[in-house]
């Protein structure tokens, strides 16, 4: 009954918005979307999810009609509200306000380039999926650790997020955590198990780390100057970098392609851990741009520099699991506010 009551509230709240399509258009779009994403609902749930989908469809249409460089679409999160999305998929809670502007500028390499992409160098594992577990911090941690191990040992090994969720006790498993705490666990534990030996379950469990299954070790980690995108660029030239961002907005939830810029984003209140694997400039069409619903053309005043960011929501979200986030645009969404990378 609680689930039904909750869905009834959702049904009422989303049904009041002004509709932009005919009922037939909504129904056909929802039917196609359910087939594409292999979704099914109980009879009690269908009506609420349908109305949420319609509201998200309207939001996508309104956003894309403005010709933003950010293109939204009806991705795998199109049947949930923004509140549900935030409560289920965002698991890093961090206030960076005390750090920004208080640290000495850190430079990690003297070399620089117009672009960088660790994927092309073989340092990045395929996109993973955290499921309905707020363990984003663990995926960000394994991603940067996999990159550091690759550079040191010459082999790309997929590492265990479940190991971190179960055993990194400074963190809170599926209820959230910080990448720096996870680095400290790996350092103090003298290793992290491989993904194959300690597979992901998307739930909290008992720690079952086995040293004989360790896939990588770390000696330390480095932090990027809080708020400095030039320091972050220097770090990304050294290794894939774990970053915390503000991903709370509906525009991030429904991102499909283009360069992501959200004027309402916070650079201090961060709620999602992801992995910066490179940077570049341009429209983003050469970085795996998917078929969005609008052109996503850059306006003359818009920056076309971006960070290449690996997410942990599967390949149905974004550009095959990636997002291009605005670069050198006032630290949008806090991309450089809390960034760090490990050292083998």
From Swiss-Prot:
Residues 1-17 form the signal peptide. It is found in: Lysosome. InterPro entries: Papain-like_cys_pep_sf, Pept_asp_AS, Pept_cys_AS, Pept_his_AS, Peptidase_C1A, Peptidase_C1A_C, Peptidase_C1A_papain-like, Prot_inhib_I29. SMART domains: Inhibitor_I29, Pept_C1. The active site is at 136, 272, 311. Glycans are attached at residue 297. Keywords: Disulfide bond, Glycoprotein, Hydrolase, Lysosome, Phosphoprotein, Protease, Signal, Thiol protease, Zymogen. The keyword Glycoprotein applies. Glycosylated; contains GlcNAc-alpha-1-P-Ser residues. One of its GO terms (cellular component) is lysosome. Its EC number is 3.4.22.-. This is Cysteine proteinase 5. Belongs to the peptidase C1 family. Pfam families: Inhibitor_I29, Peptidase_C1. PROSITE patterns: THIOL_PROTEASE_ASN, THIOL_PROTEASE_CYS, THIOL_PROTEASE_HIS. Disulfide bonds join 133-174, 167-207, 265-333. Residues 18-111 form a propeptide. Transmembrane segments: none annotated. One of its GO terms (biological process) is positive regulation of apoptotic signaling pathway. One of its GO terms (molecular function) is cysteine-type endopeptidase activity.
